[in-house]
A protein has these predicted regions:
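Short, solvent-exposed loop/turn elements at beta->coil junctions and helix N-caps
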Residues: 40-47, 161-164
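Charge-rich, low-complexity intrinsically disordered segments
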Residues: 100-103, 169-205
Length: 205
């Protein structure tokens, strides 16, 4: 089950969001040592966690976070355009048909195989979600190691510029072109499976 959380239904998912923000702190602050704001000593929440953010969240039967990602509109404030435009050789792509993938977070307590399965379910849900909303392109900023994985997943993806060293970590920007062929391309590499979640198709963004 993948929950799609927006400003319209966020009140229903407060506990799941809190669990997600706690894991984001464990992963990005405690493990990766990113210099990010921490709220109440527990939650990694930044300026982009606003009313325009869309979250895809997978939880266990108790509502605890297993994996998540955040999607941001690029015609508004977003990470690539605001913080890392220099990673793009021709400027950060912005449009109402472009969304940015951010904060892909997998529960660090899960075994590696489980994390991979959760990641694939999140990617599948993301593809279904953006196709349903006629989003044509996804962008993002990731470490060079994860960028290499993204480029090999099978979809139409390319770097937006050369990776650069930032605060001791090599990072790069990418774009993914999304269309009706994307699910099939990802199925060929064992990543995509259709995700059935009733509420997301009815959810207003």
């Amino acid at each position: 089950m993948v929950d799609i959380v927006t400003a319209a239904n966020r009140w229903e998912f407060r506990e799941r969001l809190d669990s997600m923000f706690e894991d984001r702190k464990r992963v990005f602050v405690d493990l990766l040592r990113w210099a990010l704001p921490v709220t109440d000593g527990r939650f990694e929440i930044d300026q982009f966690d606003d009313a325009n953010a869309v979250y895809l969240i997978i939880s266990d039967s108790a509502g605890l976070h297993l994996g998540s990602m955040r999607l941001l509109r690029t015609d508004r404030s977003h990470i690539l355009g605001d913080l890392f435009p220099y990673l793009c050789a021709h400027g950060a792509p912005t449009d109402t048909k472009i969304m940015e993938i951010t904060r892909l977070c997998l529960c660090p307590r899960l075994p590696a195989l489980d994390r991979r399965q959760i990641r694939n379910r999140l990617i599948s849900g993301m593809v279904d979600y953006v196709l349903a909303r006629d989003i044509k392109t996804l962008t993002g900023v990731v470490t060079a190691r994860f960028l290499a994985q993204i480029l090999k997943m099978g979809w139409r993806c390319e770097p937006l510029g050369l990776p650069r060293m930032v605060d001791g970590t090599t990072i790069g920007a990418f774009r993914i072109d999304i269309d009706e062929a994307t699910p099939r391309l990802l199925q060929m590499t064992g990543i995509y499976e259709p995700v059935k979640f009733k509420e997301y198709l009815d959810c207003k963004v």
